[in-house]
Regions:
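Hydrophobic N-terminal alpha-helices or hydrophobic patches in metabolic proteins across all domains
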Residues: 1-234
Length: 234
């Protein structure tokens, strides 16, 4: 328990102390990935993240107003709503989640229809994204240290899972950020609330649960193997 707290404090301090260069690498890699996917980056904008962690530089892409959104994006919205509705009728287990996503899509379309000429500042997206990302990166060691160091039979393996989850969170954030920027560029704010929920908050939770499940599965498997070996030898 003491080791878990020490590791958590050390990693959180390092993430806070090197926040600016970490976000710069994040921005450069995100811009590079966007370029590979032909997503235009029109510039970079300094954004404030938290007191003591500023300024960060966020990549900027052009975001169309709702009146400028093409027919393809509008048809994709309609197909998505119909598809989610059909799936919700068929599968009761995930019906509540799908209904929530449908409500987000309908609300987004209604608000965009009322404010067709509203211009969204892509720099605001970058600022919100980095605020959420830095909060996750600073707090993540506290969760992973308690989860992995307590349940892993070997301390080295627990430390490995902690570092791997931190690195994966960084890489996963780049991919999700570029995906969200692509949605903004091609469809404006039409899909954005739904996408933000899926690749933002829910995405962070899913990745943490994924790592926790894998680590527990491996630790449990090794314990069963050790018990089987001990039973066979005795």
């Amino acid at each position: 328990m003491v080791l878990a707290l020490v590791v958590a404090m050390a990693l959180s301090f390092l993430m806070f102390h090197f926040a600016i260069p970490i976000m710069k690498v994040h921005t450069d890699l995100a811009a590079g990935l966007a370029g590979k996917l032909d997503l235009p980056i029109v510039g970079w904008k300094p954004v404030g993240v938290f007191p003591g962690i500023e300024p960060a530089s966020a990549p900027i892409t052009s975001v169309p107003r709702f009146e400028e959104v093409g027919t393809g994006a509008r048809v994709a919205w309609l197909v998505t709503v119909v598809g989610l509705s059909l799936v919700a009728l068929r599968f009761q287990l995930i019906r509540s989640l799908l209904v929530f996503l449908i409500v987000l899509l309908l609300a987004s379309a209604a608000v965009n229809s009322m404010f067709e000429r509203y211009e969204f500042d892509a720099g605001v997206f970058g600022q919100i994204w980095y605020r959420q990302a830095m909060l996750v990166w600073i707090l993540l060691p506290w969760f992973t240290s308690l989860l992995f160091l307590i349940f892993q039979p070997r301390v080295v393996e627990g430390l490995g899972w902690i570092l791997l989850s931190q690195i994966y969170s960084f890489v996963f954030s780049i991919i999700r950020m570029v995906f969200a920027m692509g949605v903004l560029h091609h469809s404006g704010l039409l899909f954005f609330p739904t996408v933000w929920f899926l690749v933002g908050t829910l995405g962070e939770l899913i990745f943490l649960l994924q790592f926790y499940s894998i680590s527990i599965h491996r630790a449990t498997g090794k314990q069963f193997q050790a018990r089987a070996s001990w039973a066979s030898s005795s």
